[in-house]
Amino acid sequence: MTDAEWTAVRPLLPVPAWLQGRGGQPEGYCHRQMLDAIRYLVAGGISWRAMPADFPGWGRVYAFFRRWREHGLINEFHDRLRGKVRESEGREAEPTAGIIDAQSVRAAATVPADSRGYDGGKKVPGRKRHIVTDTLGLLLVVAVTAANIGDRDAAAGLLARLRRLHRDITLVWADGGYTGGLVDWCRDKLALTLEIVKRTDDMTGFVVLPRRWVAERTFAWLMNSRRLARDYETLSASSEAVIRWSMVTRMSRRLARPRAAGRH
């Protein structure tokens, strides 16, 4: 990452336990090196063992990745960055509306059979990424399931988690795959309005639909990271972490960009 990116993200890094007097040994590596190594892996799509010699050993980098995943540190770091990006765009740190969508991707041979499936609608064998973004396309919550899990089935748990983590959100836009009882369930159980954005009968071919395109653009952003071109992770939790790392890179660059004069 550039010096400008490091300056932007360094104050947002989670504080190690030993610095807070909660025990543990001082970390024997530079956080910037570790972040660079993981960003390189996610962007380039390399395997862990193919980590270049310029970075710390692949075992140490993977241990860092695993520790941040297991202790929720990547979630914490990602969410702090998102809040800063929103504020830089003149928004409140916490959003009030979101967009839900799902994407099926092929799975590599490293993905266990019990966590993969076949999406009959998209004709894709593998896993499915379920996301909710804010109106800027920034990730709020993510869940990775087998591809045969229906959008509505995964949405209930995803939206419940969204409501728990982001109490200000009262409106979520969705496509026609989320119709049915889910709309009433969200209203009655979560006090959340799920608004379905549908195509009209006079629409033919590719049409950019209001609101829905935001989440679709986020999926396009993710696919720019070669590690996410298909799912290579053994654990679904690792897939979710890689998605967050991809967004961390995008948000870091966004924060480091020079702001136009007079822009708020």
Summary of predicted features, one role per range:
Residues 1-264:
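Short alpha-helical elements
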